[in-house]
Amino acid sequence: MERIYLLLLLFLPRIRSYDVRSVTTSWGMVRGEVVSPEGDDLPPVAQYLGIPYGVAPTGQYRFNMAISAAKWTHMPKDARKVSPVCIQTDMPELSETKAFKHTSAQRFDFNHRLLPHLKKQSEDCLYMNIYVPERLEISRDNYLPVMVIVHGEEYGWGTGNAFNGTTLAAYGHIIVVTLNYRLGVFGFLGRCESSSCSGNSGISDLVSALTMLNVILPSFGGDSKSVTLAGWGSGASLVSLLMASPLTQPGRRLFRRAILLDGSALSPWAISQNPQQYFMQLAEELACAPKNRTSSFNDNVDTIVRCMQVHSSENITKAVLKIDVPTFLSGFAPIVDGQLIPNKPQVSFSTQYGSLFREIDLLVGISSNPSHHMISNEDLKVGISKEKRMRIFRSLVRNLYDFHREEILASIINEYTDWENPRDHPKSIRNGVLNALSDVLYTAPLIETLRSHSADEVRKEANTFMFAFAHETRSWSQEQPNSGIRGSLSGDIVPYIFGYPLAQGDSEERLYSGFNTDDKGISKVMMHYVSNFVKSGDPSKPNPMSKNFPMGDVFHSTAWPQFDQPNREAYLEITDRPRVKNYYRNAQVGFWNNFIPQLHKNGKETEPVGEEHHLLSDHFRKDSYFGKTRHFSSYANLPFPPPPMPPSPPPELTTKPKPSESPTTLQTTTESEKAAAGSFTGKALGGVIFIGCGFLIMNVCLLIAVRREWGKKRRNEKKFQLQYQTYNSNHGGGAEQYNSLNSPEPLLSASHKNSTSMRPAGISPTCPRHGRAALALQNSRGNSLTAAQAPTLEEIQV
């Protein structure tokens, strides 16, 4: 027994020297471990799990902005276990019977696989995981680019711990970082006072993590100047918001590139439309505000927040479940606060104000059916009736629009009806509903994001690429071969980017499983393109596609152009037969981005009509809707006018001129963008211009009047001065004696001022009659009169 123990002691240091890796950073030393990725003889990867980047947001720090983590220089940090996940406030239904009434079988299966990763929850959850491929040596010349993953699905649940970055790091030869950030009410408790809003603490977590990474990445062999931020679903929305956030540019940008998968801040669900309503409802449920309030706004916001900070996380989570959020919208989500989110995304992404947004390299990926998880499993199998389609579309119109609802509803039904199949088969109707929800909630906003980023009005150095992921994972599909649903489903892109199909065998414990040989080839293609983009901002560079695997030969010969007007909005369709196509779902995108906004805009600008004109038929019948509807109110989509945009960097620092294009290529600003920007600035700008012009006219008139009075006074002064000079020269008065208009008028001759006898008449030149008579008499006498001979006042008066 002693020999065995001695042998273990002998070999243990050798094993640990291979398994353990220590890295010294400015925050302190961290100890991770080396693991071998599954499949294809990939190099080992050192993983450092559970590295803190923020102070535990509890007590007085709850609901507030993130604070950087304290340093641990006194002792090494053990980084071999993942941290607890953040509090999950809006978990999906886990009962199969109930879940299948609201979601697909594929999403239900994924939720169950994710559940084990969500069991250990805590508010102390601001941690990240770093995956570094092993190399022989590290120097400044071979620092690795970095990809930071922002997990998605929804704002209320999820974790970065569940996604293993070892395969992607080893295959792509990049550093992969996953992290946790506050979710739901803990990360997005929006509240508004009389003139400002706050509540984007979850986004501040991401900024805090990026700030720390920019400092410590060189210690891990990472390039802090080559960071890519990637996200899907709600995570993609957060990434796009950070692209336009001034807080990501303290000195230089905290990240250089971005990847958006099935999500954008332009989606209707991306921004909370009425945060104060949810804030006050939560305050009532927690007894932090009276229930008999008459207004959604309260001057004691700080007092209410302090009351909420005292409650336990369990109480808050239970209270959130009692708050109804309209279907297709988000309750506790990012808000426009003027700091992290300076303005509405439609404005921040525009060509006029989007200089920060447009200087980031962008790669966008869209699945074939991004709203697949929003259709119930039964409806996906057998189809949807016309009556249910009407309820779904009525809820969509009521929750997303305020004006001309009947006209918008009729337009949507007309657009997504298969007129070539007049029988209205339930599966045909299902396909129309699936396409409509995918287009309005995902596809159209993403295309609008791409167009704003690639607009040619002010050409920039950043690249813009798009791919449509159409590969089908056949083993996941529960549909029959003739179901009519083709292509990828919501969430399908993620496992292919992380390299899950390369794992050997299937396991129920894995987050994803059930892949075949074709799936493995597509996964290699996706990891190659993504790692290339992380390195250079171009999916095709710097490394060409390898031909050493079945799919590689096909993709090697396929060029991938940029998404812009000169290339006719080109994108790469990723299937086993890749093709470059143009104008992705252009007719449907035009319907949602141009026609519907114009129809809705006319309702705002036309003559006032009765409010009932904009209501749907049977507007208040609850059974005529699907899910939860927005309450009847006239509130605007933003509680207050957003603050003005911060100053943009000088154009010459962020953009470069481009040779002139034809007028058709320069026309990239869509009507929806103009409507969004116009609706925001039109009335306010018009009022400012009107008032400014009024003040300008008043000032000009006042200036003219003052100028005229001053000129008149000057002319009189000159006239008086001339008359005084003539008078003094004729009567012996020196100019030095009477050269001031402020002196008393001279009535007596200065030479006789001490005489008591009758003096010569001193005629004031200001006398219109006597002054002229005196001058005429003087001229007739040849100017030879002495003082004694001068005419008396009586002589002149006769």
Swiss-Prot record:
UniProt feature, compositional bias: Pro residues: 639-652
Stretch forming the signal peptide: 1-17
Pfam families the record matches: COesterase
Cysteine-cysteine disulfides: C86-C125, C288-C307
Keyword Metal-binding: no
TM annotation in the entry: 686-706
InterPro entries (alphabetical): AB_hydrolase_fold, CarbesteraseB, Neuroligin/BSAL
GO cellular component: axon; cell surface; dendrite; plasma membrane; presynapse; synapse
Alphabetical UniProt keywords: Cell adhesion, Cell membrane, Disulfide bond, Glycoprotein, Membrane, Signal, Synapse, Transmembrane, Transmembrane helix
BP GO annotations: chemical synaptic transmission; modulation of chemical synaptic transmission; negative regulation of neurotransmitter secretion; neuron cell-cell adhesion; postsynaptic membrane assembly; presynaptic membrane assembly; synaptic vesicle endocytosis
Extracellular-facing ranges: 18-685
Subcellular location(s) of the protein: Cell membrane; Synapse
Residues annotated as glycosylated: N164, N292, N315
Oligomer and partners: Interacts (via extracellular domain) with isoform b of madd-4; the interaction is required for the localization to postsynaptic domains. Interacts with unc-49.
Protein task: Probable neuronal cell surface protein thought to be involved in cell-cell-interactions by forming intercellular junctions through binding to beta-neurexins. Plays a role in the clustering of the GABA(A) receptor unc-49 at postsynaptic sites in neuromuscular junctions (NMJs) via the interaction with madd-4 and neurexin nrx-1 and is thereby required for normal GABAergic synaptic transmission.
PANTHER family, A to Z: NEUROLIGIN
Recorded domain comment: The cytoplasmic region is required for GABA(A) receptor clustering. The extracellular region is required for the localization to synapses and for GABA(A) receptor clustering.
Protein name: Neuroligin-1
Species the sequence originates in: Caenorhabditis elegans
Taxon lineage: Eukaryota, Metazoa, Ecdysozoa, Nematoda, Chromadorea
Gene name as annotated: nlg-1
